[in-house]
Amino acid sequence: MAGLALAGSQRESESLLNFVVRRFVRDDGDLDGSGCTWFDQFRIYPHAWLLMAAILRARFDLVHRWSEFLQGFQDPENGGFYGTLQQRELRGEQEFMTTGVAAIALLWAGRTEAAVRTGHWMRRLLESQPDIRRQLFFVWDRQQGLVTSFPEDRATEYAVNCAATAQWYFQYGIGAALTAGLFGCTGDRSWLSLGRRFLDATKFCRDDVYRQAASGKIGWGAAWMYRVTRDSADRAIAEAVYTKLRTSQHSGGGWRADTIYSRDPGPHESGQMDLTSEFAALQSWMEDSLSLRA
């Protein structure tokens, strides 16, 4: 829905938003989870994108409901978000993607204090890294701190291994996108320094870091950083990701990535609705920033 609105399809965005509310949204603002194969793992992630869509469509009734819902999953002390009902009850794991995108959506909604708390959570997570040149651990346990031990078959869900390809590179971009937004709201340049550290860390990854479907959010973060820094290095990263994003779009207009989100990707030539909606939004934000002169 946000992707449709940013692409200029306002009526279609409004119609789809209305359909989602009628079909999937419960009275408390939660989704029923039907039709989403990754819902149990990233429980509140879709609410963040719905909140951004509601803001774009000036649906303030929905903005309030989803803002309140998301803030109910934020730890009031450390600023991270519990991605599932179970983790909130346990006061357990807070993973980077859900935490970052939820904070960005709340920043859009004017809930700056909540977003700033998440910014401090990100700084703490980054400063706790044993060696960011080798790995980016991106899950924080509320009781034990940075999670560095996990089952080998789930390693991709806990850390970016800089020596391997096809990692969840989007973590770096989410960090840069949020911190660029925090600088815009607060004028505090320390947020730009933090965003720079996230983007600089991508240089330790393999050469596919800007060419995977999981790289899309790196382009987003670099684009929002470039918008406020006019740094040629930020622009170069955004351009690299944007170019790959354009060339990987299927002839029918959609995108797909079998290693992200989908547990049942379907026919190879088809696009994935969730990924396509996100990539349309990311592409729009990159285009806007890349149109600016240095």
Please report, for each region that a protein language model flagged, where it lies by residue.
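Glycan-recognition and catalytic cores of secretory/periplasmic carbohydrate-active enzymes
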Residues: 1-294
